[in-house]
Amino acid sequence: MYNLIKDVKKLNPLVIHYTNNVTINDCANVTLAVGASPLMSFSYEEVEEMVSVANSVVINIGTMNSNMLDLFLLAGKAANKYNKPVVLDPVGVFASKARAELTSRLLNEVKFSVVKGNVSEIKFIGGFNVRGKGVDSFDEEEDSTEIIRKIAEKLECVVVATGKIDIITNGKGTYKINNGTDKLKGITGTGCMTASLIASFMAVTENILEAATMGVLTMSLSGELANLNNPPIGTFKENLMNAIYQMDIDALSKNSNIEFLN
């Protein structure tokens, strides 16, 4: 699985993003840092053409509005048409009725390879009661592994639930990642950037579970390494991007705290 970090850098896959305008710059930069090539678009007119040549697709509802629904649906359906792996990041799905309805329609009409969110977002999608505010989760203290696994079975895709312990599962096999730092919460967009990393790895392998795990692990481990010596938040963000850029098989092998459950 760790070899995927080399494959991304070697193949430089094209990852098209239909994402939010708060974190779009960071998502583009993190895609470059890991070795892929980002394309950011809000254009209806080019969806078919762009998705057909991309290697993977990101759909992120973070700054959704009434005009975005059709764009997201168009992009998702194009990804399915051209057999491109696509990740959904349902940012703040529990925060409003409009977000919940948008996400429900996307899940009903598009076959996603990965659905990625924090624990509260994923549990909400699965029909469970959640504790959260805005786009932030308060559900991280309890072990939600079995709940997330059942949601993955229901959605018939890989599900990523980030938190104190990150959970990645397709309903059959499950990875749990114990790397990371609370300081990742102090930067807007680390979740969005994680979706970009997942898409970068999905673009170079058919093993979606491993690709999603590598995306989450790269962010969590890079955050841990970036926080050595407890730098202030601005320095931490710079360190984070540098750590992602420098991530390699050796660093993954030496520092990953990961377990696999059947």
Swiss-Prot record:
Its EC number is 2.7.1.50. GO terms for cellular component: cytosol. Pathway: Cofactor biosynthesis; thiamine diphosphate biosynthesis; 4-methyl-5-(2-phosphoethyl)-thiazole from 5-(2-hydroxyethyl)-4-methylthiazole: step 1/1. GO terms for biological process: thiamine biosynthetic process; thiamine diphosphate biosynthetic process. Its cofactor is Mg(2+). SUPFAM superfamilies: Ribokinase-like. GO terms for molecular function: ATP binding; hydroxyethylthiazole kinase activity; hydroxymethylpyrimidine kinase activity; magnesium ion binding; phosphomethylpyrimidine kinase activity. HAMAP family: Thz_kinase. Belongs to the Thz kinase family. Catalyzes the phosphorylation of the hydroxyl group of 4-methyl-5-beta-hydroxyethylthiazole (THZ). This is Hydroxyethylthiazole kinase.
